Design a protein with these regions (language model features):
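Extracellular beta-strand-rich solenoid/capping regions of secreted or surface-exposed proteins
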Residues: 71-78, 86-103, 109-128, 132-147, ...
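Secretory targeting and sorting signals
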Residues: 1-41
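Post-signal peptide N-terminal regions of Sec-secreted extracellular proteins
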Residues: 42-58, 96-98, 160-164, 188-192, ...
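Acidic Gly/Asp/Thr-rich repetitive segments characteristic of extracellular carbohydrate-active
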Residues: 47-83
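Right-handed parallel beta-helix
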Residues: 99-105, 122-133, 145-161, 177-198, ...
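Extracellular beta-rich repeat passengers
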Residues: 228-231, 238-241, 245-330
């Protein structure tokens, strides 16, 4: 395969190396961490690449329970906090304006049948929502040409009773979006988890962008794209993945730092050499692979995140994530 120069300092491409489960475990580096996040302790602001995202901030909240009222409430770029009460059926996606917080009420509010779209906006928080069965071509949440986004404590789900293309992605981030944190969410029963970077042919728009942090998420019975990242820089830490075929996928020169995650009943925990003409890069440390294999053809230069964070050891991740991730856990 040809090699795309990495977004961080260039390096010569190493010979392809497929790392076995045993070798990966032996090479795992124990990361130095501060105090671990306590289970379910919801942050008041995002950690990671999405740091500084405030959404509607301290704006007075409005509560809606119908689709018409929701569409009106999230329109425009003035600061706003919109509370969703109950489950609203969609047949497509609703566009969300800049400087918006969308917050579910209780543990069972949200949307089904479609999703939310963040297109050419900035400073948006999506929190405490149930988002289910986004019928194609709608994603559960689409982040497109947008910056400063926090996706936190939501429950995304579909089913695997239909063809893999019947539903679209649960969370897709594309078209040069940047500075995104995805934290404390559950992703369940789907073929396609989170696609970051939609096409091998979109280097001109995506290179230097798609900086995304995924932490403390639970992926259960999700076949692949956990996440799939092209061109960008991804930090995937303290996540719990079970029942996947292919989990973390770095491609088209993307840089992935994968640390302190737990994988169970998963075939391939990390791959850098599938499905694209250009391999990605990955660094692994402190992970509990649980018997999963890794396919790391290129070790990357992204070894240290450019922000402060407290990663907990893999030994406590399952307890923290299963008790703290998803809607209704704020």
């Amino acid at each position: 395969m040809r090699t795309l120069p990495p977004p961080l300092p260039p390096r010569s491409r190493p010979r392809r190396l497929v790392v076995s489960t045993v070798a990966a475990a032996a090479l795992a580096i124990t990361t130095a961490v501060a105090l671990p996040q306590s289970a379910g302790a919801a942050e008041t602001s995002p950690i990671g690449f999405g740091a500084g995202t405030t959404g509607g901030g301290g704006a007075s909240a409005v509560t809606v329970s119908t689709l018409a009222a929701f569409k009106t409430a999230v329109t425009g770029n003035t600061a706003k906090v919109v509370r969703v009460s109950g489950l609203i059926s969609l047949t497509g996606q609703v566009d969300i304006g800049s400087n918006t917080t969308v917050l579910g009420v209780g543990s069972s509010s949200g949307f089904t049948g479609g999703g939310l779209r963040l297109k050419e906006v900035t400073n948006v928080v999506i929190r405490n929502l149930n988002i289910s069965k986004p019928v194609a071509p709608s994603d559960g949440v689409t982040v497109q040409k947008s910056t400063k986004v926090w996706i936190d404590h939501n429950s995304f789900s579909a089913d695997r009773d239909h063809d893999k293309d019947y539903y679209d992605g649960l969370l897709d981030i594309n078209h040069g979006s940047d500075n995104v944190t995805v934290s404390w969410n559950t992703f369940k029963d789907h073929f396609k988890g989170s696609l970051a970077g939609h096409s091998d042919n979109n280097a001109s728009e995506d290179t230097g962008h798609l900086k995304i942090t995924y932490h403390h998420n639970h992926f259960s019975n999700v076949y692949s794209r956990i996440p799939s990242l092209r061109f960008g820089t991804g930090h995937f830490y303290d996540n719990y993945v079970e029942g996947a075929d292919t989990a973390v996928h770095s491609r088209m020169g993307a840089q992935m730092l994968v640390e302190n995650n737990v994988f169970r009943t998963t075939k391939i925990a990390v791959t850098t050499n599938r499905s694209s003409d250009v391999d990605g890069y990955a660094n692994l440390r402190g992970n509990d692979l649980g018997g999963a294999a890794t396919e790391v053809s290129q070790v990357g230069s992204f070894t240290s995140a450019p922000y402060g964070y407290s990663a907990e050891p893999a030994s406590s991740v399952v307890a923290s994530v299963t008790s703290g991730a998803g809607a209704g856990k704020l």
